[in-house]
Amino acid sequence: MKKIHPSAVIEEGAQLGDDVVIEAYAYVGKDTKIGNDVIIKQGARILSDTTIGDHSRVFSYAIVGDIPQDISYKEEQKSGVVIGKNATIREFATINSGTAKGDGFTRIGDNAFIMAYCHIAHDCLLGNSIILANNATLAGHVELGDFTVVGGLTPIHQFVKIGEGCMIAGASALSQDIVPFCLAEGNRASIRSLNLVGIRRRFDKDEVDRLSRAFKTLFRQGDLKENAKNLLENQESENIKKMCHFILETKRGIPVYRGKNNA
């Protein structure tokens, strides 16, 4: 059963799933699609052409789907946001819609946890089970792989790609691509080690050991792309293949830290 506060504004054409709760002074725009068991809390705003998956929570004064902060954007362009299931979007977070430079949509996968005051700009592509801590700021066209964590107060430059299972430390500033399963920190951020906490949660000890050896082979010395090419030969681990292909395909470069690594 839907529960909609009398002061909430629901525009014509909005599609609301079963058991949706919309609290006081919330706004839901036209052509939105709100899944089952979604809660939109007091004062939150869901703008036109936004899709939010089942069992999600949008907290007070978050704004999802407003127009891009891009001076080339024209209002007549098709533009929206697509968010998967089980998302948590905390207070004052902002998620902008996409532009014609992408496919018109900013996209976020399932199980996202987006903390207070985070900003996700136009055309970002975020995978499943990502976490953005308070005040993390993603510029346009940033891509995050599944299971990636971005620490609080960390800005990420436009077009940066962060691979699966990464950890970006809090109060860092990132302007280059980060290889899957790695931890980066600093201003400017560079790769310091494997994200051991993250990979131990997901993989068995044998795979963790293989990834640790691969990290040392890739990053300790020599040319990074040559190391990746050599490591790919007869490689059986799919996760190590992901690391190597990412290195070979990067467009913004990989920030390599040549000091003491912990993996």
Curated annotation (Swiss-Prot):
Its main location: cytoplasm. It is an enzyme of class 2 (transferase). It comes from the Bacteria. Its EC number is 2.3.1.129. The keyword Zinc does not apply. It catalyses: a (3R)-hydroxyacyl-[ACP] + UDP-N-acetyl-alpha-D-glucosamine = a UDP-3-O-[(3R)-3-hydroxyacyl]-N-acetyl-alpha-D-glucosamine + holo-[ACP]. Keywords: Acyltransferase, Cytoplasm, Lipid A biosynthesis, Lipid biosynthesis, Lipid metabolism, Repeat, Transferase. Signal peptide: none annotated. Pathway: Glycolipid biosynthesis; lipid IV(A) biosynthesis; lipid IV(A) from (3R)-3-hydroxytetradecanoyl-[acyl-carrier-protein] and UDP-N-acetyl-alpha-D-glucosamine: step 1/6. InterPro entries: Acetyltransf_C (IPR029098), Acetyltransf_C_sf (IPR037157), Hexapep (IPR001451), Hexapep_transf_CS (IPR018357), Lipid_A_LpxA (IPR010137), Trimer_LpxA-like_sf (IPR011004). The keyword Lipid biosynthesis applies. It is found in: Cytoplasm. Homotrimer. NCBIfam families: lipid_A_lpxA (TIGR01852), PRK05289.1 (NF003657). Belongs to the transferase hexapeptide repeat family. LpxA subfamily. Involved in the biosynthesis of lipid A, a phosphorylated glycolipid that anchors the lipopolysaccharide to the outer membrane of the cell. This is Acyl-[acyl-carrier-protein]--UDP-N-acetylglucosamine O-acyltransferase.
